[in-house]
Amino acid sequence: MNTEKPSVAHNVDHNEIAKFEAVASRWWDLEGEFKPLHRINPLRLGYITERSGGLFGKKVLDVGCGGGILAESMAREGATVTGLDMGFEPLQVAKLRALESGIEVEYVQETVEEHAAKHAQQYDVVTCMEMLEHVPDPQSVVHACAQLVKPDGEVFFSTLNRNGKSWLMAVVGAEYILRMVPKGTHDVKKFIKPAELLSWVDETVLKEQHITGLHYNPITNTFKLGPGVDVNYMLHTRAKKA
């Protein structure tokens, strides 16, 4: 990782933003570029809901919300949800979708570091899913998420492990062979080993509670959670009590 860190207001890779801006209009197309996100969302939502003891009545922040797939589903569970993203077009899509579906979600265009400076310890649950591998300084994002959650609150991360298998599965397989996501979506150099993510967590008030893998079976075309964090994985952490 670069020793020279971007400022908190600019922990943004504009090339990454441009990728998602270009396809934002198709965010809610169940057969489009974001089909895998729609497919895994019930697993993500179930994991978050179960591990946090339910979302009803809780204040939730979704960091890197994109077009709002996870944010909207958490709002449907009865949470008061704020979605953060630096992409203008994805947020416009998310806002329009919320109006059409009658689901109330507040969408904000700012970095998580900027949000943490104004809203420290204000959320019961913070989610940061499939986002860390798209920013210049993921460690800074982890720290900001820790600042945003209330004492004894829950923070969830998901990302991709960095190894040969994840390159084969997430880049070669998903982008070039199965064409599940657009070519160039992922850069294996930006993938994050679980040990790296856990070391950043240990620098904060957060403590690891559970880690699980997210697995795809190309034969049955299904996803499931289970042991093994070689490729995609999700991490549940909890903030220390006050």
From Swiss-Prot:
Q: Which reaction does it catalyse?
A: a 3-demethylubiquinol + S-adenosyl-L-methionine = a ubiquinol + S-adenosyl-L-homocysteine + H(+); a 3-(all-trans-polyprenyl)benzene-1,2-diol + S-adenosyl-L-methionine = a 2-methoxy-6-(all-trans-polyprenyl)phenol + S-adenosyl-L-homocysteine + H(+)
Which Pfam families does the UniProt entry name for this protein?
Methyltransf_23
Keywords of this entry: Methyltransferase, S-adenosyl-L-methionine, Transferase, Ubiquinone biosynthesis
User: In what pathway does it function?
Assistant: Cofactor biosynthesis; ubiquinone biosynthesis
Q: Kindly state a single biological-process term from the GO annotations of this entry.
A: methylation
Superkingdom to which the source organism belongs? Bacteria
The EC number(s) attached to this protein equal 2.1.1.222, 2.1.1.64
Q: Which residues bind S-adenosyl-L-methionine?
A: 44, 64, 85, 129
Q: Name one GO molecular function term.
A: 2-polyprenyl-6-hydroxyphenol methylase activity
The task this protein performs is described as: O-methyltransferase that catalyzes the 2 O-methylation steps in the ubiquinone biosynthetic pathway.
Family matches, as NCBIfam families: UbiG
Q: Which family does it belong to?
A: Belongs to the methyltransferase superfamily. UbiG/COQ3 family.
In Swiss-Prot or TrEMBL terms, this protein is called Ubiquinone biosynthesis O-methyltransferase
Q: What is the scientific name of the source organism?
A: Salmonella paratyphi A (strain AKU_12601)
